[in-house]
Amino acid sequence: MLRYRLYFVGLYLCALLYIAAGINHFVNAEMYLRTMPPYLPAHEALVALSGVIEIVLGVALVLRPKTRLRVWAAWGIVLLLIAVFPANIQTYLNMKATADPRLTFALVRLPLQLPLIAWAWAYTRLMPQRPKSR
């Protein structure tokens, strides 16, 4: 029973993280614009699009958590995290070039992408069976 409950607690926390992050793309768009690699076009549109995608994927994780929708949403989050990794690298490079005091945070953020990917990936599989009541 505990494993089943933890599965859903983690699922809802994961969804909340991505919904909040997506909303933050609109509330603090300037922060995300600074992380955009210069080789990408339409920075404003890409920041807004990634915010919408994070919100949609977060909602999809919990909208019907016992269906394939959750699986597809989790795979979407995994792919999104891989896709935005260059922006995390760009943030580090920008901060390194300007001796930004947040450089250490930007450096630590890079390997933190792996546990976030693993967390989302955990929801790409079938959920554990609910234990039968005694």
Give the residues covered by each predicted segment.
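Membrane-interface extramembranous regions
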Residues: 1-134
